[in-house]
Amino acid sequence: MKFLKNVLEEGSKLEEFNELELSPEDKELLEYLQQTKAKITVVGCGGAGNNTITRLKMEGIEGAKTVAINTDAQQLIRTKADKKILIGKKLTRGLGAGGNPKIGEEAAKESAEEIKAAIQDSDMVFITCGLGGGTGTGSAPVVAEISKKIGALTVAVVTLPFVMEGKVRMKNAMEGLERLKQHTDTLVVIPNEKLFEIVPNMPLKLAFKVADEVLINAVKGLVELITKDGLINVDFADVKAVMNNGGLAMIGIGESDSEKRAKEAVSMALNSPLLDVDIDGATGALIHVMGPEDLTLEEAREVVATVSSRLDPNATIIWGATIDENLENTVRVLLVITGVQSRIEFTDTGLKRKKLELTGIPKI
């Protein structure tokens, strides 16, 4: 016990030393690190994307610039962001895209130079929107194409509509998804319909609120995995190794405040209806373990070991652990499983698992 007490006291002294007694060389190194830190921009397209940007801005997102783009001037006025861009001023006159993705696309092309200027110095660009409407569905692929052309690692985090929103909206979403696939390194898809499997019989208003929460947590969790100092830090090169050409990706989110909180949180994430794929064939995984001040390294390792045991031995796994003071006694796990496109097919009613055809097996 005395040994442990001494270790804790020495650790406390070391923290004080790190904060108070930096040499000129150390300060120079810190300044250099700040200058060379990966520049990350989050772009919210359309109504759902703007809502996400506003929430991220209000809650605080560490180490990222926020940009909101829209064809609707009124929505943009209500949005909080570091940079706002009203796209397609000549085309829509600030009145919106009327649910037409083609108008959203043309509006983004009209404002391409302004979009490019807003993300020009970015090493990584996150694009977020709710697919199915006009502005987000139409503009997000244009933003992604611009991002790729400037050499940024380009990741989109998007939602698919609820089935109750109608076939036209779902058809728009699937077409937008196909265009996004062409211009993104990794495309993270959140099928809203699957939320009903998590919370059955949700009222309509609550369903949309839950969808927004999932989108916000996914974007924030991904960004802060890179930008936020934590127990285990992940650098940009690590993330790039998983997300560069990561293809289609799915997420799983779980949390628990029980005695076995880490075990239960990762189990929930792996069994999340949102992660509706066979992950054994995935090419990579990003794992973000979040928890309060008493989050232990052993808990983080337990999460990673559990996920690793389910993946192909050749899959690239990157993980990090950060402290979130808002998570009182709760461990939250965010999984992003990449390279799952071979298991998924796109239909006008959403994403479906492909039926695997078994060959060489005699019929009985």
Swiss-Prot record:
Belongs to the FtsZ family. Keywords: Cell cycle, Cell division, Cytoplasm, GTP-binding, Nucleotide-binding, Septation. It holds the Pfam family Tubulin. Essential cell division protein that forms a contractile ring structure (Z ring) at the future cell division site. The regulation of the ring assembly controls the timing and the location of cell division. One of the functions of the FtsZ ring is to recruit other cell division proteins to the septum to produce a new cell wall between the dividing cells. Binds GTP and shows GTPase activity. PROSITE patterns: FTSZ_1, FTSZ_2. This is Cell division protein FtsZ 1. Homodimer. Polymerizes to form a dynamic ring structure in a strictly GTP-dependent manner. Interacts directly with several other division proteins. One of its GO terms (molecular function) is GTP binding. It is found in: Cytoplasm. GO terms for cellular component: cell division site; cytoplasm. It comes from the Archaea. InterPro entries: Cell_div_FtsZ, Cell_div_FtsZ_CS, FtsZ/CetZ, FtsZ_C, Tub_FtsZ_C, Tubulin/FtsZ-like_C, Tubulin/FtsZ_2-layer-sand-dom, Tubulin/FtsZ_GTPase_sf. GTP binds at G47, A48, A97, G98, G99, G134, T135, G136, E165, R169, D212. Disulfide bonds: none annotated. GO terms for biological process: cell division; FtsZ-dependent cytokinesis; protein polymerization. SUPFAM superfamilies: Tubulin C-terminal domain-like, Tubulin nucleotide-binding domain-like.
